[in-house]
């Protein structure tokens, strides 16, 4: 469990801390994290997936806190779920192809502003409740 928590939650925060000064220098000050819809506490009606759900839920808490802390620096922060994507890890039953996921993620990043910082987005542009 700890290796998954380190990869999904701790490493993204440490990387953000290491790159913080770089974010301040950017023209478009945006930090985007890839989470997953199963990390939503509100949307959890299926149970199971304890390691993945809990580590990504913890990441979402980090993301929300960063959005509050960094807004004064003009940095927008978002959590994005790429959807269930047809990849080696997503498997053949996944619902969307890579192009659909990436196109949606790119659109969300392009539209990310301080006004909508601290949100949890699905790849299709819909908000996911925390």
What role is predicted for each listed range?
Residues 27-36, 80-89, 110:
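A short, hydrophobic/aromatic-rich structural module that often spans a beta strand
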Residues 16, 87, 117:
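Ser/Thr-centric signal marking residues that sit
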Residues 1-6, 10-14, 20-71:
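Catalytic loop of short-chain dehydrogenase/reductase
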Residues 79-82, 91-130:
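C-terminal helical subdomain
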